[in-house]
C-alpha cells in the first residue's frame, strides 16, 4: 500500500505501522522438460522456485520491449503495477511522485493512463510467454479510490458494495483493521458475495489475458473465514483460480495473522526485509541475525525482499538511503537462499542514496539498470541452478562482515559488507579447481576442501562450475536432500525438471524407473506400515547426454512415537536448552515449559538431543536453542520450524538425526 499525500491524523500511525519490527499454488508450472521456447537455465521451473522482478511503474510496452533483458538477467517472473482503471490525480501527471494513484481503483476494467491499454497488456503477456517469463499482477481488491465521485457506476451499482471510509483507529484490533478504511479509501464489503464475484471476474479476465498470478495489495485488511462474526469466504473464493502463484501483502504486526493467511496464499516477510536492511546499515551480516525469516510461516510460503515499493517510495523513506552496493549485498543474501521466493524492487532511474524521485524518468519508463547488473544477474542465475540444494550460512573466520552461503557441493555465494577487501580461507564442499567470480572481478581456488581467494570491498562473489548452468536439473519441490523427511499418513510429492532436462526419471526404493515431466506428482505411504523408509532417486539427462542425480529420503512415522530433535552446538555452549513452543491464535503454548525450556542431553557423537512425549502435538511448533542467555535464532526472532528427527545448526535445519 501507500501513505503518500494522505495528510490525515492517521498518517503518522500508518507510517509507524509500516515500520514495525515486528498460497494458493494452483497447479504445477505448465512448462515441461520438452517445452521449446526461449527459456533456458536462466529461468527457474516455477515462479515459486525463481526470482521476481517488481517492474514498478513500468508500462506494458516498456515491459514488452525489455523482456529479453529481463529473461537474460535470470528472472522467472515479473510483477506489474496495478493494471485496472484508477483515479487520474493531479491532472494525470506521470511524475514518479504520483505513483500512489495507481492504488486508487475506480473500476476493474483492465487498462489505465499510466501503464497502457488492455490490448497492450495482452501483447506484453505474449512477449513474456515467448521468453518463459511469468506475469504477476498487483491486484488492489481491498479498496477503491477515496474520491467517491470518481468511482465508476459499475462499482456503485453493486448493492451494499462498501464498508464506507471510516478510518482505522486501532491497528491491534482485527475488526478495525479489516472492516474499516485504510487512509480514507472506500473499503470493499468483502463479505458481500456480489462483490466477491465482481472482483473475481477481474482476476479471471487478467488470467485469460495472459497473467500467471497475483500480488494481493493490503491483503491483511480483508478478513479471514475464522475472524469471528465478521469472517467471510472471500479468500477461499478469490484464490480459487487457475493462477500458478498468489501472494498477499501482509505487513507483520500483532494483528496480521500471517500463518492464517498462508493457508490461502504465500505471504510477505516484511520483518525479514527490516532485518536485512538493519544488517546492511550496520554492515554486520552475522548469520545469527539474518538466517531466520522472522516469521511463523515456513520459508517456502514467503516472498522476501531487500526493500519494497512502500519502504522506498512512502514519505518516511525507510529504505531510500540504500545505495546500489547495499542492494547488491542484500540481494546476495536473500536470493542465494533456498526456500523463499525473492522479489527485486526496480527503483526509478537515478534513485537511492536518499533521493526518491530524481526526475530522470516518469511513470511508464524502465527503472534503473540495477535489475540487470552483473552481480544481480549472477545471483539470480545461482538461485535458479541451485534449486533443491541445501543451504549452509556462515561467517568465514568469524568475520560478521563476510556472508557465505554454501548450497550443497554445487555453489557458493559470498558478500563483503566491509570497506576493505578480505582474504578468504575457509572450508568448502566445492570440487577442487579454479572458480571465476560470476558476479564481478577476481577468481577463487579450491584445493582439498579449502576455498581461498580475495573478495573486494562492498562486493559479491558467485562461484559454481560452468557445467552446472547447462546441466540437467531435477528435484522434488519443497524438499531437501541430505535430510530424512517424516510424514504420518500419505504424502503427495511434486517432481521438477528444468528446461535443460530432456529426459527425467525417478525410482522409489530401487524400483523400476518411471519417466516424468516437470510438475508431475506421485504419492507414497498409502497403506504402508509405520517405520517404512523411502529412498527416492531422480535422474535428469540433457541433450548432450550429461546426467545428474538427486537422492531424497522419507520415513512414515507413527504420530504416537517419541519426538526427538538434535542440535550440533557449533558455539560449544556448556549448557544447551531447547525452548519449543507454538501459537494458538494470540496464545503461546510452551511445549517445554517456560524459558529457557528443557536441557538437552549430549550424546557420544557430540550431538545434543531432546525427546518430547509421544503424545505431544508439535504441529506448527518452533524451537529456539539457547544456553540461558545467548540463543539461536537471535533475540526477537521466531524459532526454527520444528521437524521431527531434525538435526539443527545455527542456520536452521541441517539434516536428520542418525538412526
From Swiss-Prot:
Active site location: 217, 249
Superkingdom of this protein's organism: Bacteria
Signal peptide (UniProt feature, chain positions): 1-27
Gene3D superfamilies referenced in this protein's UniProt entry, alphabetically: Glycosidases, Golgi alpha-mannosidase II, Immunoglobulins
Positions of the pro-segment in this chain: 28-41
Location of this chain's protein in the cell: Secreted
Binding site for Ca(2+) 1: 142, 178, 187, 221
Co-factor remark: Binds 2 calcium ions per subunit.
Entry GO MF terms: alpha-amylase activity; metal ion binding
Protein name, UniProt field: Alpha-amylase
Record lineage: Bacteria, Bacillati, Bacillota, Bacilli, Bacillales
Amino acid at each position: 500500500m501507500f501513505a503518500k499525500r494522505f495528510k490525515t491524523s492517521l498518517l503518522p500511525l500508518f507510517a509507524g505501522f509500516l515500520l514495525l519490527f515486528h498460497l494458493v499454488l494452483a497447479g504445477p508450472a505448465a512448462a515441461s522438460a520438452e517445452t521449446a521456447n526461449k527459456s533456458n537455465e536462466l529461468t527457474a521451473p516455477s515462479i515459486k522456485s525463481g526470482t521476481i522482478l517488481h517492474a514498478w511503474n513500468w508500462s506494458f510496452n516498456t515491459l514488452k520491449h525489455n523482456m529479453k533483458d529481463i529473461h537474460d538477467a535470470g528472472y522467472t517472473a515479473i510483477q506489474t503495477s496495478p493494471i485496472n482503471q484508477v483515479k487520474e490525480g493531479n491532472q494525470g501527471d506521470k511524475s514518479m511522485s504520483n505513483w500512489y494513484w495507481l492504488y486508487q481503483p475506480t473500476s476493474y476494467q483492465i487498462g489505465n493512463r499510466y501503464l497502457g491499454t488492455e490490448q497492450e497488456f495482452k501483447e506484453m503477456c505474449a512477449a513474456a510467454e515467448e521468453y518463459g517469463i511469468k506475469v504477476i499482477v498487483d491486484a488492489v481488491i481491498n479498496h477503491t479510490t477515496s474520491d467517491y465521485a470518481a468511482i465508476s457506476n459499475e462499482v456503485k451499482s453493486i448493492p451494499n458494495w462498501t464498508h464506507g471510509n471510516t478510518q482505522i483507529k486501532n491497528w491491534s484490533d482485527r475488526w478495525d483493521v479489516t472492516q474499516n478504511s485504510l487512509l480514507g479509501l472506500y473499503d470493499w464489503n468483502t463479505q458481500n458475495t456480489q462483490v466477491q464475484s465482481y472482483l473475481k471476474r477481474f482476476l479471471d479476465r487478467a488470467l485469460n489475458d495472459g497473467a500467471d498470478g497475483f500480488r494481493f495489495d493490503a491483503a491483511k485488511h480483508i478478513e479471514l473465514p475464522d475472524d469471528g462474526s465478521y469472517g467471510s469466504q472471500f479468500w477461499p473464493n478469490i484464490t480459487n483460480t487457475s493462477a500458478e502463484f498468489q501472494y498477499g501483502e501482509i505487513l507483520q504486526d500483532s494483528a496480521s495473522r500471517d500463518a492464517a493467511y498462508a493457508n490461502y496464499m504465500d505471504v510477505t516477510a516484511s520483518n525479514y526485509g527490516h532485518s536485512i536492511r538493519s544488517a546492511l546499515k550496520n554492515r554486520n551480516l552475522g548469520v545469527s541475525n539474518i538466517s531466520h525469516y522472522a516469521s511463523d510461516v515456513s520459508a517456502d510460503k514467503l516472498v522476501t525482499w531487500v526493500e519494497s515499493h512502500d519502504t522506498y517510495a512512502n514519505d518516511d523513506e525507510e529504505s531510500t538511503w540504500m545505495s546500489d552496493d547495499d542492494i547488491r549485498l542484500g540481494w546476495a543474501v536473500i536470493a542465494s537462499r533456498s526456500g523463499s521466493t525473492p522479489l527485486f524492487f526496480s527503483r526509478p532511474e537515478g534513485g537511492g542514496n536518499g533521493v526518491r524521485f530524481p526526475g530522470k524518468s516518469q511513470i511508464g519508463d524502465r527503472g534503473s539498470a540495477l535489475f540487470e547488473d552483473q552481480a544481480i544477474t549472477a545471483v539470480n542465475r545461482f538461485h535458479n541452478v541451485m534449486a533443491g540444494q541445501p543451504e549452509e550460512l556462515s561467517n568465514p573466520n568469524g568475520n560478521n562482515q563476510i556472508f557465505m552461503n554454501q548450497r550443497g557441493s554445487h555453489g557458493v555465494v559470498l558478500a563483503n559488507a566491509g570497506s576493505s577487501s578480505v582474504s578468504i580461507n575457509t572450508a568448502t564442499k566445492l570440487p577442487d579447481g579454479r572458480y571465476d567470480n560470476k558476479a564481478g572481478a577476481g577468481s577463487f581456488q579450491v584445493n582439498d576442501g579449502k576455498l581461498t581467494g580475495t573478495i573486494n570491498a562492498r562486493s559479491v562473489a558467485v562461484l559454481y562450475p560452468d557445467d552446472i548452468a547447462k546441466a540437467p536439473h531435477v528435484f522434488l519441490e519443497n524438499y531437501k536432500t541430505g535430510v530424512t523427511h517424516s510424514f504420518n499418513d500419505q504424502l503427495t510429492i511434486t517432481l521438477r525438471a528444468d528446461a535443460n532436462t530432456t529426459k527425467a526419471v525417478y525410482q522409489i526404493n530401487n524400483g523400476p524407473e518411471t519417466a516424468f515431466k516437470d510438475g508431475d506428482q506421485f504419492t507414497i505411504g498409502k497403506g504402508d506400515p509405520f517405520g517404512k523408509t523411502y529412498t527416492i532417486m531422480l535422474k535428469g539427462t540433457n541433450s548432450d547426454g550429461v546426467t545428474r542425480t538427486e537422492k531424497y529420503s522419507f520415513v512414515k512415522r507413527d504420530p504416537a512415537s517419541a519426538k526427538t530433535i538434535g542440535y550440533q552446538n557449533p558455539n560449544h555452549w556448556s549448557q544447551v536448552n531447547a525452548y519449543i513452543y507454538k501459537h494458538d491464535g494470540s496464545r503461546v503454548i510452551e511445549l517445554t515449559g517456560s524459558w529457557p525450556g528443557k536441557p538437552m542431553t549430549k550424546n557420544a557423537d557430540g550431538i545434543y538431543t531432546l525427546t518430547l512425549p509421544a503424545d505431544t502435538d508439535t504441529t506448527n511448533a518452533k524451537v529456539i536453542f539457547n544456553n540461558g542467555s545467548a540463543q539461536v535464532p537471535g533475540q526477537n526472532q521466531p524459532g526454527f520450524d520444528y521437524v521431527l528427527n531434525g538435526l539443527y545448526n545455527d542456520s536452521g535445519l541441517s539434516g536428520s538425526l542418525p538412526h
